[in-house]
């Protein structure tokens, strides 16, 4: 199974198939769950939902971003930012991380990832907004994220772990191609609300939600 401060541009998103019935299933840790976390299977929503915008300028921004390799992001500042010191290590061949590491192919892909000057920029694909800057150190066999810069939102203001878990999830899934659970705010208790939050956040590149930190996720191989 299973350079300058930028004004934040809103993402006026419209869902298609929003009235369809969806099946959400909780899986405890065990034989039917390949992860060492309790997860909510939201694939019936995230893998079938379509998103589009009625705003021409947003569609134009999305199309413009498809041709970018992220060089224009160098020295971009994040307004009212905070930083978190971390140590997240990922396998790597030692080469410089430059250019586009992941590009959205459609509007259900919500993120682009770029690397320049030992900074990984995680940006919203619709608008180009830099949400996270991950400062890295590259070695012969790995790269380590040592610091994350971000602007707090309504959820991360009260729970910084969401920032670290978001960045880890995006690197694991988009840059490294893993199927992985993602962490959601504990204030979301309705299953459909969890699915909507997840799709807004990650588009169709998310499958299983959890309330737990995912930094130590282990995957069982059948």
Please report, for each region that a protein language model flagged, where it lies by residue.
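Non-catalytic accessory regions used for complex assembly or targeting
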Residues: 1-52
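A broad structural signal for short, well-ordered beta-strand segments within beta-sheet-rich domains
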Residues: 83, 108-111, 131, 143-147
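Generic structural hydrophobic/aromatic packing signal, biased to beta-strands
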Residues: 24-26, 37-42, 113, 134, ...
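Polybasic, proline/glycine-rich intrinsically disordered low-complexity segments
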Residues: 142-222
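Canonical SH2 domain fold
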Residues: 119-139, 147-150
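Generic structural motif
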Residues: 45, 55, 118, 127, ...
């Amino acid at each position: 199974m299973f350079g300058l401060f930028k004004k934040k541009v809103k993402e006026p998103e419209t869902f298609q198939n929003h009235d369809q019935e969806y099946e959400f299933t909780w899986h405890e840790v065990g034989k039917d769950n390949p992860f060492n976390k309790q997860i909510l299977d939201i694939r019936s929503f995230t893998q079938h939902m379509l998103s589009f915008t009625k705003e021409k300028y947003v569609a134009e921004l999305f199309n413009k971003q498809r041709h970018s390799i992220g060089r224009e992001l160098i020295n971009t500042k994040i307004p009212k930012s905070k930083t978190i010191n971390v140590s997240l290590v990922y396998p790597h061949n030692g080469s410089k991380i430059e250019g586009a590491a992941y590009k959205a192919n459609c509007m259900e892909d919500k993120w682009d990832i770029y690397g320049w000057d030992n900074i990984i920029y995680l940006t919203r694909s619709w608008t180009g907004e830099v949400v996270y800057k991950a400062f890295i150190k590259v070695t012969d066999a790995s790269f380590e994220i040592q610091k994350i810069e971000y602007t707090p939102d309504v959820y991360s203001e009260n729970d910084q772990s969401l920032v670290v878990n978001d960045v880890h999830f995006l690197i694991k899934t988009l840059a490294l191609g893993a199927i992985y659970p993602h962490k959601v705010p504990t204030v979301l208790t309705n299953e459909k609300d969890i699915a909507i939050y997840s799709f807004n956040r990650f588009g169709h590149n998310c499958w299983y939600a959890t309330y737990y930190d995912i930094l130590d996720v282990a995957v069982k191989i059948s």
